[in-house]
């Protein structure tokens, strides 16, 4: 959590203003941070809350459950009767996510699908008001076709960690060779969602970079 794309003083000041939440998920959040589980950064969490309160999504799809924290968090701000489908492939995290969802009494609201997101997305149908992608960064570009198919008109796509601690802005030659494929794929992803005829996208330097895309209806598509 030490790598920041914003000045550390600004980040710490923003975090100092954060208030207690109405939900009781702080123990799940702090345990995940202590164990270096990659959950959303505090300021990204607040952005998610704002988007859920604005959009009032009845159906959310999450790619990358980790230990279930962000699903539980988003669900606590969804309208009554709102549901979430979340996907995770890491067995250790799946076990913890199931435990957390059960302990919060949210098994009716949150469905955890286990396995590879690319395969699971292909098999899903229906329409989601908000889709949150927070998984392996090199896979975002491979998720996109199915994510767009599953996103409702005027639905919101939130992609987390898109600035890669600032690396995405650097030349590929400044990136370690082993990270260059991910670097290229994320750049391709950001270019695609910024220029896609169905999407209006803004990229924010929040947390480790968040892209927010709105799926335009047929009549509103960019000319």
Where do the PLM segments sit?
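A short alpha-helical cap/connector motif
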Residues: 1-130, 137-158, 162-223
């Amino acid at each position: 959590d030490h790598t920041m794309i914003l000045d550390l003083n600004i980040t710490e000041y923003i975090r100092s203003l954060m208030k207690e939440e109405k939900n009781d998920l702080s123990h799940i959040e702090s345990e995940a941070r202590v164990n270096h589980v990659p959950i959303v950064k505090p300021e990204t969490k607040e952005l998610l809350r704002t988007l859920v309160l604005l959009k009032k999504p009845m159906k959310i799809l999450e790619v990358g459950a980790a230990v279930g924290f962000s699903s539980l968090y988003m669900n606590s701000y969804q309208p009554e009767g709102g549901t979430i489908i979340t996907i995770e492939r890491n067995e250790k995290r799946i076990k913890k996510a199931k435990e957390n969802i059960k302990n919060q009494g949210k098994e009716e609201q949150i469905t955890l699908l286990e396995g590879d997101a690319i395969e699971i997305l292909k098999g899903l149908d229906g329409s989601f008001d908000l889709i949150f992608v927070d998984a392996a960064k090199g896979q975002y570009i491979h998720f996109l076709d199915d994510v767009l198919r599953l996103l409702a008109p005027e639905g919101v796509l939130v992609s987390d960690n898109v600035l890669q601690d600032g690396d995405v802005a650097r030349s590929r030659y400044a990136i370690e060779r082993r990270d260059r494929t991910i670097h290229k794929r994320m750049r391709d992803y950001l270019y695609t969602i910024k220029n896609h005829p169905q999407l209006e996208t803004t990229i924010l330097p929040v947390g480790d970079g968040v892209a927010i895309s709105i799926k335009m209806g047929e009549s509103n598509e960019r000319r």
